[in-house]
Every structure is written in C-alpha cells, then in structure tokens.
A protein has these predicted regions:
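Short interface patches used for recognition in eukaryotic signaling and trafficking proteins
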Residues: 4-8, 34-35, 47-50, 209-213
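Extended non-catalytic scaffold regions that mediate assembly and binding
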Residues: 3-5, 40, 89-90
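Extended, charged/polar low-complexity intrinsically disordered regions
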Residues: 63, 67-273
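Extended, well-ordered alpha-helical scaffold/bundle regions in very large, multi-domain proteins
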Residues: 1-12, 16-19
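Amphipathic alpha-helical packing elements
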Residues: 20-76
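Short, charged/polar, low-complexity loop and linker segments
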Residues: 1-7, 26, 95-104
Length: 273
C-alpha cells in the first residue's frame, strides 16, 4: 500500500502507459507494412509474424513456420549446396510426404516478406504447368496410371476434367445419338466402381488412402449429378442439351488454351452459373 501512495510512481505510470501505447502503434504500423507486401501475413498473429521476420537472414530457420502462411505446405526443399535456393515444396504428414518440384528455382534472399511473395508466384506457375500436363494426360492414360502419376490435387482435377468433357459431349450429341446419355451415365458408374475397388487394396500410406477416398467422394457426387441429368433427359420432351441450365449450373472444369490468367496464356477454368 505504501508503494501505491508513492508520488513518483503515480507520476511515472501514466508516462509509461503512454510510451507503451506509442510502441504498440509503431509496431502495428510496422507489421501493417509487412502485411501489405505479403498479404498472407494478415492471417498470422502479430507474435508469429515477429518470429518469422526475425528468421529472415537464414531461410532454413523458416521451416517450422511455412504451415502458418500456406495451406498443405509445411516444408520446402533447399539446395544442399546453396540454402538460398528453394527447389521444391512439401506436405509432410507423419512418415508420408507429398513433394512438388518447382518449375523454376526460387531465391530466398533479401527481405523475407519479399521472397515469400516470390515463392507464392513460383508455386502458382508450377501448379499451372502441372495442371496443363494433367489436362493433357487425363484423357490419354488409364485411370490407374493417371492417378498414380499425379499428386492428389491433380489426380482429382483430371477426373473432373474427364467428367466434364464426357458429360458435355453426351449432351451435345444427345439429339443425334439417342443412347449416348445413358451410355455416359453407365460409364460414370464404371469409373466409380474402379475408384471404389482401390479402397480395398493396400494403398501403402495414409496420404495415398486419403487421396483415393477423396476421389471416390467427389466422383460419387459427379456420378449422382449426371444420373439426375440422364433421368431428366429421359423425362423431358426433346431431352437436354449442353446449353440447358440444368447442366450449366453445375461446377464444370476445363483447360482453355484460348483463355489466360495472371501467369500468361491458357488457363484452368471452373465454370458454373
């Protein structure tokens, strides 16, 4: 109680509080500048950002913090002879690992918020290139070979590309070929049965099992969607075509060489109205 009555303390505490407020505002302003450069920092706490920024001079020290700023990326692979070069991104879960090699080496030098932004761009360019490859492969390879050759994201995308292409072709040709809609409906069931049969096999890793189960889950929905369309086609006078709203409102996946995105010509387009 005697300390609380001390005049010096009573006069000093308000000053210290004002200084603390000033420091807090300065810190918020500093972190806002960093967030403006690398917007993913908006989803990270102030304390975590300060730790990340303090590691900027050594890219290897960033390893524990990638999962705070990226989804499904919790490590990167550095060049063994030059730690400033990032060669690949990884998703590691227990003993399982999913690795994607970057199309172009990313240099982890300079301010950490700057090179993290460059890493995002290289990741996007790499995934776009893999998307283009998946779009070309999915119609040419067997289902099993295609799924085995691609990580989960692109195995799923390839199945969605195929489903969209097959269903759209059936609806476009429905007036000339009376059987094509039902044939395509049966084809989607065959795909689902093949995917489901893999779940009974030894898939080696939990990550691979999760990948196959995801493909099954999504294709169950896709198969149900087209089954409903096939039923509507049978019941409606004149049937359906590819311009019908019942088809256009579905999520459809295309690789468009004539489209473009932030990284140049051609693009993956997800359509739906």
């Amino acid at each position: 109680f005697r300390s609380c009555a001390n005049e010096l303390l009573k006069n000093t505490l308000p000053v210290l509080y004002d200084e603390l407020e000033r420091c807090q505002k300065s810190l918020e302003g500093y972190l806002e500048q960093k967030r403006a450069i690398f917007p993913r920092f908006y989803f990270v706490s102030n304390a975590a950002i300060l730790i990340i920024l303090s590691q900027g001079s050594d890219p290897l020290q960033m390893q524990p913090y990638y999962e705070k700023v990226f989804d499904s990326v919790n490590q990167v692979e550095h060049d063994k002879s030059d730690k400033g070069k990032i060669l690949a991104i990884k998703n590691i879960s227990g003993s399982d690992e999913e690795r994607v090699k970057l199309a172009k080496v990313c240099l982890a030098s300079g301010s950490i918020e700057v090179w993290l932004g460059k890493l995002v761009i290289e990741m996007q360019k790499t995934l776009k290139a893999l998307c283009e490859t998946a779009a070309a492969q999915c119609a040419e390879m067997s289902l099993g070979d295609f799924v085995d050759a691609n990580c989960a994201q692109f195995a799923l995308l390839g199945i969605q590309f195929n489903w969209t292409a097959q269903c759209q072709e059936a609806l476009e040709k429905a007036k000339q070929n009376k059987a094509i809609v039902q044939d395509t409906n049966r084809q989607q069931l065959v795909v689902l049965q093949e995917l489901s049969s893999w779940c009974l096999n030894d898939l080696k890793t939990k990550m691979n099992r999760r990948k196959i189960e995801t493909l099954v889950t999504i294709h169950v929905h896709q198969r149900d969607v087209f089954e409903d369309l096939a039923r509507l086609h049978r019941s409606r006078k004149g049937g359906l075509d590819a311009g019908d709203f019942e088809w256009l409102k579905q999520a459809r996946f295309y690789w468009r060489p004539d489209a473009k995105d932030d990284h140049g010509p051609s693009a993956c387009v997800v359509a739906g109205c």
